[in-house]
């Protein structure tokens, strides 16, 4: 049952979805797992946000928690822009805003994968044409990645497996990474199918959605003809 309701949830559990989506819980998971994230903080008031920006330093990326499609996301480069954002922002204790260090001149990477709780299948590692900070829905990406070293691709695949198994994901999931110099950062994890899954299927021939659907009904990766 899920959240006290008489409903059976197939695939990734509600708790695992919350751990991937909740800022503080995921940061704790990342620390335990040895994953690097941009410096960040959460705020529910103007004072919270000003304190976070003072600690992190400009530029910062501010966005609401638990939203899709990049709604409300802004890159702020100075105090004037922060003041303007705070005038328009909706602030409430139950509607936190996330403040992150903005990684300038970083390459964004999208990964689509599937996990059955025992194994992880990395469907594709996609390189974005635009720098990190442009929402992935507005960005062009490539399969295969064009400018990423084999060593970095191996690190990305390894961290994808750590995340999929560590969060107990069952089915599809998507990870957004950023590469800045030789550093690899985890930007966010989406414990679900993403907008790029159809692109992965067309470009690679790998039916990731079908594979993930079979996982959710009890067919592990080892029993699928992949």
Positions of PLM-derived features:
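ATP-dependent carboxylate activation and anion-phosphoryl transfer catalytic cores
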Residues: 1, 7-11, 29, 33-34, ...
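Short acidic active-site motifs
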Residues: 48-49
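Short acidic-hydrophobic, aromatic-tinged amphipathic segments that line or gate anion-handling sites
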Residues: 40-45, 75-78
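A short, GP-enriched loop/loop-strand-helix hinge that lies immediately N-terminal to
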Residues: 1-21, 36-42
